[in-house]
Amino acid sequence: MQGKHLRSLLKVIPKNNVRYFLNGLYVNFDYREIAATDGHILVLLENLEELNIDGTGEAIIPRNVIEAASSVCDPNANVYITNTELSIGDLTIKYKPIKGKYPDFRVVFPKKETTYEDSRFCWFQSEFVKIVEKIAKDYVIDFEFFPPENEKTSPLKLTGVSSDCSAFVTILLCKMDVDINGKEK
């Protein structure tokens, strides 16, 4: 994983969400996965074999740490994450993880798969579609689509393997009037 990949995740990490634990990047060292969500769009990176992480359990890295590191680093520099440090290339920033429990985002994943031609992006906010397109470009991904089970409350699931960093990438998109847990606002 490179600095440019980390920077693209800032698009889905909120700055001041009342659910303070969402204001950072979730890292599960044991499962070697990274997730970020603002409650309407979720990005999950799995099978990060080439990700250089050294820690145990889970950590939530504050957004401002990721912003600071990715704004001054070489976008092609490798990322290294521990329970208390984030490094991109030669730059290392110590951080204090956000206390709290990251939500169990897997409970909202739809199960059925559909082709791109049969998918319906039209009922999503255009800024969400732009975020997906940007992440797909940054990670070099062709997505497979899993349609919402219920267009009113279920998320759309997109999955693909990055040919740029060999991560398995999952993105969930929810309509604006529904949060990531499927609850209407």
Question: Where do the PLM segments sit?
Answer:
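DNA polymerase processivity clamps
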Residues: 1-185
